[in-house]
Amino acid sequence: MSKSLKALFAACALVAAGTAIADSQVVNLYSARHYSTDEELYNGFTKATGIKINRVDGDDAGIIARLKAEGQASPADVIMLVDAARLYRGEVDGLFQPIHSKLLEDAIPSNLRAQPTADGISWFGLSTRARVIVYNKAKVQPADVQNYESLADPKFKGQLCIRSGSHPYNLSLFGTVVEHMGEQKAEGWIQGMKANLARPPKGGDTDQIKAVASGECTIGVTNSYYLARMMRSGKPEDQAVVGKIGVVFPNQSSWGTHLNIAGGAVARHAKNKDNAVKFLEYLASPAAQNYFANGNNEWPAAKGVELDNPALKEMTGGKPFKSETIPITAVGKNMTKVQQMLDRAGFQ
């Protein structure tokens, strides 16, 4: 048994110790996380607690639609989504059950979870992804792309690659920029980025990284874990791409780099609530948090977790980076405004 799995089993035992064993040794999970590395996390939880995980996979939008359709008949106990705006939407639509958990509240920073109510907290971030700028080292100086505002600088006209503006990763970034800049300046920024596009938005984040390396564009935007995945790849073609690009964690001298989250919630009509809370608490444990980092190259959401991931360490020069501290709920609150701005700008 690996050292990391032993640590995970120990974490599960600690989570289980303070709670009586549920009548039903099962937890039903609806998950938008499609990462094979998560299987060891799930298996570790079951081995340590005896609680079996029944999992249904889908994307964020599909899971929310399914919960609405199932209503009170839904078997779901835990919901895991990979975007803050969708978590916010699920809360607003009454699909989650607020909970009180000292373990979760102590572990997860207040800006990475739902706003508290008298009934508890509806959802918690469990891992984070930094939205970073990549640049072609032969064509761009890092000093010229130190903040998100530079993406709209006219000197980069025809040089920016980014996936669809309406993709959740970008909607999340744009939603927090509205919070930082205000609506008028944020809309001007979106229009400036549209003017700087090297091509119509297409592909995923890995495609933007490759396009920057090839010279099709000189700057791009990606989630950090896509770059870390390529950095850890043994494929020569991936290493060739990595060798041509640099990475910037934007806005270190101002509001900090934007983080989106993958997070979890207890379903509104959970039949196995105690098991659901145990599972979320397990995922917030230091061992599980480090496993998120090693398995899918994500940053831990919990406080004070030491990383083992060499790519994440290399990406930041082995130093912590400044991330924004505004409540991640701002992403959801600003979504309608952002989509209207994108429509006015003709940003696909």
Tell what function each PLM region has.
Residues 30-33, 119-123, 135-137, 143, ...:
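Short beta-strand->loop
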